[in-house]
């Protein structure tokens, strides 16, 4: 059985699915907004962005968070620093030019929440708003790291 879908949007390719469930393209995929990200070898730290033939170099801090981006002429096109919870401050350039925030987090441009595969993190409150996938096994379903050094020290001293 072959299924086909046609989109009413202009210049969209026709998608068809064969009897084995494989998607087949009939036409060229539009590449108007194609973005290629290059990562540091063996990590998730972005080091470059390629868009519309233009190459950008990304500089990250010691935590792997992007802090600057330069075009091929060496001009700064994006720059930001972060507060203690990872929220952007003092941003220069288009905010979502680089959507990566804390390592492994991708900022949703509509909600300004950071997505971590299974959860959403709100940098304005410094906590996750989605439950931990391991639920109560982590002892706090929305915790982002150790919040209290004193509680950690007391826990260590007791045991």
Cite the ranges covered by each PLM segment.
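Activation loop
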Residues: 35, 98, 117, 140-143
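Conserved active-site tyrosine of GNAT-family acetyltransferases
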Residues: 39, 60, 80-82, 121-122, ...
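A motif-centric feature for acidic-aromatic and gly/ser/thr-rich catalytic loops and repeats
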Residues: 48, 52-117, 151-152
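Short, low-complexity export/processing leader segments characterized by acidic and small residues
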Residues: 68-69, 87-89, 119-129, 133, ...
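Short strand->helix junction
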Residues: 75, 135-136
């Amino acid at each position: 059985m072959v299924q086909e879908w046609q989109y009413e949007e202009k210049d969209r390719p026709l998608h068809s699915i064969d009897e084995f469930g494989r998607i087949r393209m009939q036409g060229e995929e539009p590449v108007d907004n194609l973005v290629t990200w290059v990562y540091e070898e063996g990590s998730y730290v972005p080091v470059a962005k390629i868009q519309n033939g233009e190459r950008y170099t990304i500089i990250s801090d010691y935590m792997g968070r992007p802090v600057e981006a330069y075009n091929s002429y060496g001009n700064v096109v994006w720059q930001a620093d972060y507060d203690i919870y990872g929220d952007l401050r003092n941003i220069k350039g288009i905010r979502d030019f680089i959507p990566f925030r804390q390592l492994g987090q991708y900022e949703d441009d509509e909600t300004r929440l950071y997505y971590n595969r299974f959860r959403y993190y709100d940098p304005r409150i410094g906590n996750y708003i989605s439950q931990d996938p391991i639920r109560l096994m982590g002892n706090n379903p929305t915790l982002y790291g150790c919040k209290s050094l004193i509680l950690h020290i007391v826990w260590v001293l007791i045991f």
